[in-house]
């Protein structure tokens, strides 16, 4: 279903954002 793909994409995007934020914190 379209909404499932949308939800998955949002979840992946959120996961990447969190990962980037954690990486920035570790690098500082």
UniProtKB/Swiss-Prot annotation:
**Tissue expression pattern:** Expressed by the skin glands.
Question: Keyword Repressor on this protein?
Answer: no
Where does it primarily localize? secreted
- GO biological process annotations for this chain's record? defense response
Localization in the cell: Secreted
Q: Which Pfam families match?
A: DD_K
GO cellular component terms?
A: extracellular region
Keywords, alphabetical = Amidation, Amphibian defense peptide, Antimicrobial, Secreted
Q: What is this protein called?
A: Dermaseptin-1
This protein's species is Phyllomedusa tomopterna (Tiger-striped leaf frog)
């Amino acid at each position: 279903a379209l909404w499932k793909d949308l939800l998955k994409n949002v979840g992946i995007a959120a996961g990447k954002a969190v990962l980037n934020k954690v990486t920035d914190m570790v690098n500082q």
